């Protein structure tokens, strides 16, 4: 496999058609009728002008709209000298078909006891202890760490379930099904095709082992992340539409260090094109769950949660069988959510990288002796200091354009569309140390952050192969001709998705930027402070449990 125009895999021809469904949409508000009495609306182009001979018209316009996407086409020339014309015009046509939004689940930004996750920790601890007698040998932060660790188990189950469900989808009008989708999820398609029964067994064993622990179903935090990891979404309600989906970049592994309390550390998931097999996913799951199974406090907290919420109030994971499939859905608000996403880059895992920025590593921590035991997650985002990577953040230091379909937007529509948005408020480097990367501090984020995007298209050089592109919200077009062409080609592919993330283009030595590249509909300008308040409301809601002193 090759990445960024080097990762490839052989395509598979599909033979079964999938059905797409609409589960909801947005109604456009009535047009304003308050016009003057002399106003006249523009009229339509009347087809009757051309249809005096309807039978001949029908024969002349009979065209086959059946070209599958996921295939290479040469549109050819209609000039006298095709040889001469080919020097200037590339008539090859490839339509990209898959865009994957790679995300990391988070508890929201938290740097003291007043953050939403710490208020939620107090609420759930109060409720669980109210429903249980006796002395607890764990603190409220430990209980919240337990609940966050359970989220990663549920995401992993949804992730591998989607792999299995996608492997059974075929359609003659979209050659990206199912192979390209599996490649985007980091799995070896041939391994899934050849070992269906083993994959079904593994997915069910993940559900069974995760079901050994209790987590409250009232926390929609779990539902949100399971939904992200399960679904497929199309950019138009047609059979040849392009596909969007979500994939976890990393999950959180539970660790109990004793003296400093429990914490969650990163466990990286496969990237697009990694070609991981079933055995690799088995190792990942064992790594994720091993520290939970051997921890006494984890078992005690599970029992207390079970007693507090009851068997009917717990998260349940469904089994899979040979008929399990995931069908694509068209939903304008989900597309608006992807369109408003802003990528923060890969997690910073090396502690040495963060010298001069204490406490900003990608870990969810708590220490009873520090900050009154508050759960802390206040990471820095950044790259290795190269210009083209640093520029990916510059556009996100400004206020963002919130662009929505339709008109008359409700609070529910706005809050859903902003779930993947992140803004940055300051650029920082360690004093006097130019060798360190440029780091950016967030101005608030929600229950997940987008790390980057993966797009898959047909490779022009070898049309039976696929090309994997990884990109962010900024595209740099430098002076070098080869990079200039490659980045413009990438931009051309991205904007073929109707609701691709908004992009900014930076070019030349002066590093001037312009954008966004987007088809603006009904839009407004959103500030970092307003976005931070939205995220705070959402995190508070998604960790909801019965509360003693608040009347909703």
Swiss-Prot record:
The keyword Cell membrane does not apply. Keywords: Acetylation, Capsid protein, T=3 icosahedral capsid protein, Virion. The record marks 65-66 as: Cleavage. It holds the Pfam family PBV_CP. The 7 kDa polypeptide is acetylated. Autocatalytic proteolysis releases a post-translationally modified peptide that remains associated with nucleic acid within the virion. This peptide is observed only when nucleic acid is packaged in the capsid. Residues 1-41 are annotated as: Disordered. Residues 9-28 have a biased composition (Basic residues). The capsid protein self-assembles to form an icosahedral capsid with a T=2 symmetry made of 120 subunits. Picobirnavirus particles are capable of disrupting biological membranes in vitro. This is Capsid protein precursor. It comes from Human picobirnavirus (strain Human/Thailand/Hy005102/-) (PBV). The gene is Segment-1.
